[in-house]
From Swiss-Prot:
The chain crosses the membrane at residues 102-122, 162-182, 198-218, 257-277, 313-333, 382-402. It is found in: Mitochondrion outer membrane. May play a role in mitochondrial dynamics by controlling mitochondrial membrane fission. It comes from Xenopus laevis (African clawed frog). Solcar repeats lie at residues 95-186, 310-415. It is a multi-pass membrane protein. Residues 31-41 have a biased composition (Low complexity). This is Solute carrier family 25 member 46-A.
Length: 417
C-alpha cells in the first residue's frame, strides 16, 4: 500500500499567508524569528523547505526497521572515512620519515666521528713521526699497527683525543655563528652568488680558522701523544691548553716551539683549500646524481622511507666523495701542518714501526717552506704521504657503513609496503 502523497506542500501553508507573500505582518507565534523576504513568484524551485533534524541511524530505513543506537551491540562499525584514511597514512608516513632521517643521520655521525677516529689517530701519528722507516702506505700495515696498539695499550689508545676533536668542532661552529652575526658575512652561499659574497664567505672561514688554531694544536697533541707516558687528559684540557698557548701560560714549552703567527698561515691555508675542494666536489657529485636519477612522482605514505633514502643518500655519497677527494689532495699539506703544530711541544708518540715503545719529537723547522724542503730532502716525496693507508681504511669503513645502512632501510621499505 503506497502512502498518499499530498497534492501540495508549501511549508505548512506558509506561502499561502499574506506575510509569506511579503504583504502583511508576521503571525504572533513567528515574531521571535528573523523576518525573511520572499518573492511572490509561484515557481516551485524557489520554495524554501526546512530539512528534518539529523537523527543518528535514521537514514536508509525500510518499513518496520528501527534506528540503531550508538554503542549498541548490533551496530556494525562502518569503514573509515576518506579523511581518516589519509590522516592515518600521513601519520605513519611522518613516523617513517622521522625514523629514516634520524637513523641515516645517526649512521653518518657515527661513521664520521667515532668509527673513523682510530684511523685519524694512526694517520696523525705516522705523519709526525719523522723517525719512521715504514711509511705505512698500505691499509694492511695500518690494521697490524692497530692490533699491536690494542694489545699493548688497550682499545682506549685508538680513541684518545676524541673529546677534544668535538670541542674544536664546537668552537668552530660557535665562532662562525658569532662572527657572522656581528660582521654580517654570509655563512652560506645561495644559488645567485657573486664574487663579493664568495670573498666574504671565505673571509669568514679564514677568521674561524684563525680563532681555532691554538685549540687545534692542543687537540692534535692529545691525539698523537702516547698513552704509555701520559695520563688520560681531561675533557676541558683542550680549552685550557689552547688558552695557555694564546696567553703564553701553562706548561713551559721548548724554545723550538713555533709562535702562533707562524702557524696561522698554514692552518688557514689548509682549512680554506680543504673547504673549497670539498664544496666543489660535493656540488658536482650532487649535480651528476640528480641529473642521472629519473624524475620522481609524489609517493604515498608507504613509500616515504624510500623517498627519504632517495633524498638523503645522494647527499651522504656526495659528502663521502668530497671528504675523500679533499683529504687525498691535501694530504701532503696536512703532513707539513701537523709537524709544524707538534714541534716544540715535547710530545712523545708511539713507535709506528713496531706498535710498541715510544719516540720523542725533536724537529727544528723554521717555517712552512723549511719544513717542505726538509721532508723532501730527508724522507723523499713519499714522506709527505706517511700513514696514507689509514685514509684507505677510514673511507673503506665509511663506504661499508653507508652500504649497510642502505640495505637495512631498503629492507624496512619492503616490509612496510
Amino acid at each position: 500500500m503506497q502512502p498518499r502523497r499530498p497534492d501540495r506542500f508549501d511549508g505548512l501553508e506558509y506561502r499561502g499567508t499574506s506575510w509569506g507573500r511579503g504583504e502583511g505582518d508576521p503571525p504572533p507565534y513567528q515574531s521571535s524569528f528573523p523576518a525573511r523576504s520572499f518573492s511572490s513568484s509561484g515557481d516551485l524551485s524557489q520554495h524554501w523547505v526546512t530539512t528534518p533534524p539529523d537523527i543518528p541511524g535514521s537514514r536508509n530505513l525500510h518499513w518496520g526497521d528501527k534506528s540503531p543506537q550508538y554503542g549498541g551491540a548490533d551496530s556494525n562499525a562502518g569503514p573509515p572515512a576518506f579523511g581518516e584514511e589519509n590522516s592515518n597514512s600521513a601519520n605513519s608516513g611522518e613516523q617513517l620519515n622521522r625514523f629514516a632521517g634520524f637513523g641515516i643521520g645517526l649512521a653518518s655521525l657515527f661513521t664520521e666521528n667515532v668509527l673513523a677516529h682510530p684511523c685519524i689517530v694512526l694517520r696523525r701519528q705516522c705523519q709526525v713521526n719523522y723517525h719512521a722507516r715504514n711509511y705505512q702506505l698500505s691499509p694492511f700495515n695500518i690494521v697490524n699497527i692497530m692490533y699491536n696498539f690494542t694489545k699493548t695499550q688497550g682499545l682506549r689508545a685508538l680513541w684518545k683525543g676524541m673529546g677534544s676533536t668535538f670541542i674544536v668542532q664546537g668552537i668552530s661552529l660557535g665562532a662562525e655563528g658569532i662572527l657572522s652575526e656581528f660582521t654580517h658575512l654570509p655563512r652560506e652561499l645561495n644559488h645567485k652568488w657573486n664574487p663579493k659574497q664568495i670573498g666574504g664567505h671565505l673571509l669568514l672561514k679564514g677568521l674561524v680558522y684563525v680563532i681555532v688554531t691554538p685549540f687545534y694544536s692542543a687537540s692534535l697533541i692529545e691525539t698523537v701523544q702516547s698513552e704509555i707516558i701520559h695520563d688520560n687528559p681531561g675533557i676541558l684540557d683542550c680549552l685550557k691548553e689552547g688558552m695557555g698557548r694564546v696567553l703564553n701560560l701553562g706548561v713551559p714549552y721548548s724554545k723550538r716551539l713555533l709562535p702562533l703567527l707562524v702557524l696561522t698561515f698554514p692552518t688557514v691555508l689548509h682549512g680554506i683549500l680543504h673547504y673549497i675542494v670539498s664544496s666543489t666536489v660535493q656540488k658536482c657529485v650532487l649535480f651528476f646524481i640528480k641529473k642521472k636519477s629519473p624524475p620522481r612522482l609524489p609517493a604515498d605514505g608507504s613509500n616515504t622511507v624510500q623517498n627519504k633514502l632517495e633524498d638523503y643518500f645522494p647527499e651522504l655519497i656526495a659528502n663521502f666523495a668530497a671528504s675523500l677527494c679533499a683529504d687525498v689532495l691535501l694530504y701532503p699539506l696536512e703532513t707539513v701542518l701537523h709537524r709544524l703544530h707538534i714541534q716544540g711541544t715535547r710530545t712523545i708518540i708511539d713507535n709506528t714501526d713496531l706498535g710498541h715503545e715510544v719516540v720523542p719529537i725533536n724537529t727544528q723547522y723554521e717555517g712552512l717552506k723549511d719544513c717542505i724542503n726538509t721532508i723532501k730532502r730527508e724522507e723523499g716525496g713519499l714522506g709527505f704521504y706517511k700513514g696514507f693507508g689509514a685514509v684507505v681504511v677510514q673511507y673503506t669503513l665509511h663506504a661499508i657503513v653507508l652500504q649497510i645502512t642502505k640495505i637495512i632501510y631498503s629492507s624496512v621499505v619492503q616490509t612496510s609496503s
